[in-house]
Each structure stands twice: as C-alpha cells, then as structure tokens.
C-alpha cells in the first residue's frame, strides 16, 4: 500500500449487510457457504477479504473466530476484521496469523480509546473513518480535520502513520450528487497534505441505482 502501488481490492461479500442469503448462512451456521464467498472472491481477483459476521441472531464473538480460522486455513489472502464489537475484534486478532486489517476506528474519542490499544497490542493496520461525534462532514475540510485527529491520536498510542488507512467516506450519489466530489477532494488532500494512505467503500457510490457495476467502475 502506497503512492506507487496499484489499488488493493478488498472483497466485501463476507458481510450480511443487504445479503439475505449470507445472513441466513450465519443463522444456519453454514460455514461452507461463508467460505465459498471467500473462494469466489479470490477467483475474481480480490487481494484481501473483508470479514463481517455481525448479526443479532448469532454469537459474533465465537463465529468470527471460527470463520477467520477457516478462511486462513484455506486461502492465502489477508483478512480485514470488520466488527464494531471490541470483544469480537480482540478475539479475532488474538488468533489471526499475520498482520490483519482492522475495520475500523473513527474520530470519536470513545472509539479510539477502545480500538487503538488493540491495534498497538496485536500489530494490525487500522481503517480510520473520517467521522466523529459531529457525524460525517459535508466538506473535505471537515473530513481532513478528522483524519488529522485520528493520525494524532494513533501516534499517542505509538501507532505509525503507515498503520492507519483513512476512509474518506464514499456516499451514494443518488442522495447527494455532489458527495462524490467531496470524497475525491478528501482523499486527494489526505495524500497531499497528510501523506496518508486511503481506502474507500467504492460500491456505496451506486447504492439504490441501476447499472451499479458500471457506476462503481467509472468512479
């Protein structure tokens, strides 16, 4: 990851959000189906896999450990531990082989105080969402300010800048056509002004629109 590197594609299909079949697989404890989503994404060219098994109907703390273990036993791809459950995050990081991506922290003090100690302890790379107690800023200025705060607080915990990747937040253009420009300006300034690396949930841009693959690719 860096200025000279090609974009890193993180597969997002191991996630129940908006996926009825996957959510049912979690409820049914259908590990084979969950793993199949990882295999299909590897075949499609993903460089890493997001892993989110959070659902009210399951024990996320136990399930994320099982899924991470199974995926690592079968696939060579790095995994992104995606959870807002701090206990699940720590359990997954404790048994993870290698340096995990951690999704995520944000500019809220409470969240940084909970997540940064785990990043430092287990040596991962954390995704920093450019939002804080005031929500998501409508301007690049606001988002860059949050990114700067995240970097500064990470440094307080002894976490190097290269181990923090900022998500400039990609919003759907169907709700706000100008939001794409704000996102692009945010990531440009994070690179130019803060010297940081960035990540985006690119598919968010097309939510609720037809021809989503075309819109995602163009963006």
Stretches with model-predicted labels:
Residues 1-167, 171-219:
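Domain-level signal for soluble alpha/beta catalytic cores
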């Amino acid at each position: 990851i860096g200025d000279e590197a090609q974009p890193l594609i993180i597969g997002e299909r191991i996630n129940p959000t908006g996926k009825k079949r996957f959510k049912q697989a979690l409820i049914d404890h259908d590990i084979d189906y969950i793993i199949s989503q990882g295999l299909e994404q590897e075949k499609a060219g993903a460089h890493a896999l997001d892993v989110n098994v959070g659902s009210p109907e399951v024990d996320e703390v136990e399930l994320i450990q099982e899924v991470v273990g199974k995926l690592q036993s079968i696939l060579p791809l790095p995994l992104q531990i995606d959870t807002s459950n701090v206990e699940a995050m720590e359990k997954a990081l404790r048994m993870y082989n290698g340096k995990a991506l951690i999704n995520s922290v944000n500019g809220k003090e409470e969240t940084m105080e909970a997540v940064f100690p785990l990043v430092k302890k287990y040596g991962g790379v954390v995704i920093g969402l450019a939002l804080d107690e005031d929500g998501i800023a409508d301007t690049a200025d606001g988002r860059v300010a949050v990114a700067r705060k995240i970097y500064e607080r990470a440094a307080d915990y002894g976490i190097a800048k290269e181990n923090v990747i900022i998500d400039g937040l990609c919003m759907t253009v169907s709700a706000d056509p100008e939001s794409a420009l704000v996102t692009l300006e945010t990531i440009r300034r994070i690179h130019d002004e803060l010297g940081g690396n960035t990540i985006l949930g690119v598919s968010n841009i097309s939510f609720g629109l037809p021809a989503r693959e075309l819109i995602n690719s163009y963006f």
